[in-house]
Curated annotation (Swiss-Prot):
NCBIfam families the record matches: hisD (TIGR00069), histidine_hisI (TIGR03188)
Cellular compartments per GO CC: cytosol
Catalytic residues in the record: 729, 730
Stretches assigned to coiled coil: none
Alphabetized InterPro entries for the sequence: Ald_DH/histidinol_DH (IPR016161), HisE (IPR008179), Histidine_synth_trifunct (IPR016298), Histidinol_DH_CS (IPR001692), Hstdl_DH (IPR012131), PRib-ATP_PPHydrolase-like (IPR021130), PRib_AMP_CycHydrolase_dom (IPR002496), PRib_AMP_CycHydrolase_sf (IPR038019)
The protein's name: Histidine biosynthesis trifunctional protein
Pathways per UniProt: Amino-acid biosynthesis; L-histidine biosynthesis; L-histidine from 5-phospho-alpha-D-ribose 1-diphosphate: step 2/9; Amino-acid biosynthesis; L-histidine biosynthesis; L-histidine from 5-phospho-alpha-D-ribose 1-diphosphate: step 3/9; Amino-acid biosynthesis; L-histidine biosynthesis; L-histidine from 5-phospho-alpha-D-ribose 1-diphosphate: step 9/9
Domain of life assignment: Eukaryota
Cofactor: Zn(2+)
Molecular function terms, GO-annotated: ATP binding; histidinol dehydrogenase activity; metal ion binding; NAD binding; phosphoribosyl-AMP cyclohydrolase activity; phosphoribosyl-ATP diphosphatase activity
Species for this entry: Candida albicans (Yeast)
Cofactor annotation comment: Binds 1 zinc ion.
Gene3D superfamilies: 1.20.5.1300, MazG-like (1.10.287.1080), Nitrogenase molybdenum iron protein domain (3.40.50.1980), Phosphoribosyl-AMP cyclohydrolase (3.10.20.810)
Length: 838
């Protein structure tokens, strides 16, 4: 129930009166004093409702404008009311001046204001069984106000009111308030509920009030209650303990027998007599009030003022670029989330970073809530479309590739230019993760898996042998994996050196040798979570096994939905003889393998694809001498380049392009056509469109094709020159006599698929070649993963007496020129000794 007085204040500029009477919870301004701008309401206390008197003095547009900025109710006459209702305004937002309300008004949710009391029977009829507030305006005395306050809310100018017990020629608001209270308690006290204000609205406890304590509380604007032990004393909350309270608002319940004190407790103090407790109704400690968003709000404010050095939250406050990057990252992750649990998890992350941004700029949760309240009070709505810069560009529903002639150098350069990858912002996010895992080890892995993957683990590592129930897959899947691993092993075993030691006699008596040794500890990163990627585990693990790596460590995040590892990946790890599986993903998994933790063996090399965070972490650790860890290769978006001529099957070509386009909107898809007629070109375009329309990921395909190209070459040489310039991850040859062009015409490519019956899909899974390949043009200097990727090659030399005689003088001369005397002497001493023994 509202306080039984509505103070009239002459202007919003009268801050003193607003402050004095804000505990009433409502004030009325004349319309002449109000300028309804966008943020008009925000100048007032959060729990103060604003009313405006516009009777006979406002148009419908002006009234709607008042309602839109958050005015709780507008006082109007009946004509103004009807016009506003016709304009679509809700009746509940009006206080209508009436003598005798019409039937239409009586069936509405509007409040009334009258200048004289109604008869008892009319009052009962008009107040809708006490569900409608009726205000009354008059030239009140205190006794008159007390009498009318039983059934009405007196509207009284603030100049005639006082918060004191009594003041000459003024009406005491406390006298009016207590006159409306009732109680059935023998001691005559009133049950009183103590709560906090926005944003927590926490119930602190139950106390008891007397008329005297209420009068004192209103006058002093503090928490004052009645002591039940000492009836002749008032209880000033916190007078001895320091746990004082500021009175924000006073109200009563619908039966007028329970009072609500809304108070602001002193920071760091609770309400309960058990001094460590914030509220009598829970276990929250005094210096950590509330839960959820209110707790986050108070915690972040404390961190802003008192955060220790090294605090992540302080780092966010200090590094605005990092905070902006995290906001964008978390919004993207929320958009990508699918399950109820995943959406809630990602939304919580986004809210945290949004609140950091707000607190950094002086905005509290109560300010946000007030804006929500104001927006909920709007009566006219805009269409609500996104601003142009955020509207998604129309999808290329025609699924057409842009056609470029090789004679147009600028267009060719545009078609073959890959998107720029920005790593600086990503590294700002990755470095804190790396440092956390380095310092906290297993504990950090458990925390970060909970944070990023939504899975709470007891331990971050699954040791071999792996439980059978964690690799429970169908017999069909087992057969597919077994066949694929067999072919991959056969191809990679053939890459092993044909002889254990390769030796060459470079000069008579000088024997140079080279031999291969496996890298001892290798870490294989297999993306997981929502994806099922046993093929990646096979492509990385089988060559490691063939090379003879002693310890194979697999890292893969558990599924958010099940909390478990992908069973197909566990099965592959079992077949590989992996030592363990690190149940983590992202930069944290890479860091754990690079530096080691209590339960993760430090790896000498880390391999495997991943998102931008995985790539950034791999690039970082390979350059950190503390890690002493190498990686397979840099990574970028997946890509395919198809060379096709006029005899190529259009459906085959289209399927190869689309199998790459469905990977993601940033995938690269290029078709180089050799000597194509317009008819053949149209045949290719039609096949792409026909197949794309029926794909489950057709929207992703459409976006990819929107920046994909067909380059028209005149000759095969021209086509291969363009391909070598681009250096594709996958090169597919659908041309006549394709094998004849391999290897002489190919300089730069990750893997080549020769002929019409060699789709990329075969290489991705089961043919035997490796699908972990250089992207983004790195095929110019990197190979795909192969057996040698898991080996290091050691050289040795044996120099005999004859050999030293043959090369000794050359060595000494070169050492002399370079000024390395000890080098020269190392040979000279030996040659002198040989001469002495002759």
């Amino acid at each position: 129930m509202i306080f039984p007085i509505l103070p009239v204040i002459s202007s919003p500029e009268d801050k003193q009166s607003i402050d004095e009477f804000s505990l009433v919870g409502q004030v009325l301004f004349p319309i002449e004093s109000v300028s309804p701008k966008k943020h008009f309401i925000h100048q007032f206390p959060h729990d103060l409702d604003i009313f405006v008197n516009a009777i006979d003095n406002a148009t419908t547009d002006q009234i709607v404008e008042l309602l839109n900025v958050g005015i709780k109710q507008v006082f109007v006459n009946e004509k103004q009311y009807h016009d506003a209702i016709e304009a679509g305004s809700p009746s509940s937002r009006f206080v209508v001046a009436v003598d005798v309300p019409s039937t239409e008004l009586l069936t509405s949710e509007a409040s009334f204001v009258t200048s004289k009391p109604f008869s008892e029977s009319d009052l009962k009829k008009y107040n809708a069984n006490e569900n409608r507030v009726i205000y009354i305006e008059s030239n009140f005395t205190q006794d008159g106000a007390i009498e009318l306050a039983k059934n009405y809310v007196p509207v009284i100018p603030s100049t005639k009111l006082t918060v004191k017990r009594e003041e000459e020629n003024k009406i005491s608001i406390s006298a009016v308030f207590v006159s409306t209270l009732t109680t059935d308690r023998p001691d005559g006290l009133y049950t009183t509920l103590i709560t906090t204000p926005s944003p927590s609205y926490t119930a602190l406890g139950i106390v008891y009030s007397s008329k005297d304590s209420i009068i004192a509380a209103i006058e002093e604007k503090v928490g004052v209650y009645q002591s039940r032990k000492r009836r002749d004393e008032l209880w000033y909350k916190g007078k001895t303990s320091g746990a004082t309270q500021k009175l924000v608002k006073l109200s009563k319940d619908c039966d007028s027998d329970v009072i609500q004190f809304m108070v602001e407790p002193r920071t760091g103090y609770g309400f309960c007599h058990r001094e460590t407790k914030f509220t009598c109704f829970g276990d929250d400690i005094a210096d950590s009030p509330a839960r959820g968003l209110p707790k986050l709000d108070s915690t972040l404010q404390d961190r802003l003022e008192n955060a220790p050095e090294g605090s992540y939250t302080k780092r966010l406050f200090d590094d605005e670029k990092l905070l902006i990057a995290k906001l964008k990252e978390e919004l993207d992750e929320l958009i990508e989330a699918k399950s109820k649990e995943e959406i809630a998890w990602e939304c919580a992350d986004l809210v945290y970073f949004a609140m950091v941004w707000c607190i950094k700029h002086g905005v509290r949760l109560a300010d946000i809530e007030k804006n929500l309240d104001v927006k909920s009070l709007k009566v006219s709505r805009r269409k609500g479309d996104a601003k142009p810069q955020y509207q998604e560009a129309p999808v290329n529903s025609s699924y057409k590739l842009e056609i470029v002639s090789v004679d147009d150098a600028a267009a060719v350069e545009r078609a073959m230019t890959r998107p720029v990858q920005k790593t600086a912002d990503i590294m700002k996010l990755v470095l804190p993760i790396i440092e956390k895992v380095k310092s906290d080890g297993d504990k950090a892995l458990i925390e970060l898996t909970s944070k990023f993957d939504g899975v709470k683990l007891d331990a971050p590592v699954l040791q071999a042998p792996f439980p059978a129930d964690l690799m429970d897959i169908s017999e069909e899947m087992k057969a597919a994996i077994d066949l694929s691993m067999q072919n991959i092993e056969k191809f990679h075993a053939a890459q092993l050196p044909k002889e254990k030691v390769m030796t060459v006699e470079t000069s008579p008596g000088v024997y140079c040798s080279r031999f291969a040794k496996p890298i001892e500890n290798v870490g294989l990163y297999v993306p997981g979570g929502t994806a099922v990627l046993p093929s990646t585990a096979m492509m990385l693990g089988v060559p490691a096994k063939v090379a003879g790596c002693k310890n194979i460590i697999v890292a893969s995040p558990p599924s958010r939905a099940t909390g478990k590892l992908t069973p197909e990946v566990v099965y592959v790890a079992h077949k590989l003889g992996a030592k363990c599986i690190v149940m983590a993903g992202g930069a944290q998994a890479v860091t754990a393998m690079a530096y080691g933790t209590e339960s993760v063996l430090k790896c000498d090399k880390i391999l495997g694809p991943g998102n931008q965070f995985v790539t950034a972490a791999k690039m970082y650790v390979q350059n950190d001498t503390q890690a002493l860890c190498s990686i397979d290769m840099p990574a970028g978006p997946s890509e395919v380049l198809v060379i096709a001529d006029s005899n190529a099957d259009a459906d085959f070509v289209a399927s190869d392009l689309l199998s790459q386009a469905e990977h993601g909107v940033d995938s690269q898809v290029i078709l180089i056509g050799v000597g194509l007629s317009d008819e053949k070109l149209n045949e290719f375009q039609a096949a792409v469109e026909r197949q794309a329309k029926v794909l489950p990921r057709k929207d992703i395909v459409a976006k990819c094709l929107a920046h994909s190209y067909i380059l028209l070459a005149k000759t095969y040489k021209e086509a291969f020159d363009l391909s070598n310039q681009y250096a594709p991850e996958h090169l597919i040859l659908q041309i006549d006599d394709a094998p004849s062009y391999v290897p002489d015409s190919i300089e730069n490519a990750g893997s080549v698929f020769v002929g019409a019956l060699s789709p990329e899909s075969c290489g991705d899974y089961s043919s035997g070649t490796n699908h972990t390949l250089p992207t983004y043009g790195y095929a110019r200097q990197y190979s795909g993963v192969n057996t040698a990727t898991f080996q290091k090659f050691i050289t040795s030399q044996e120099v005999t007496e004859k050999g030293l005689q043959n090369i000794g003088k050359a060595v000494m001369e070169l050492a002399r020129v370079e000024g390395l005397e000890a080098h020269r002497r190392a040979v000279e001493i030996r040659m002198e000794r040989m001469a002495e023994t002759k």
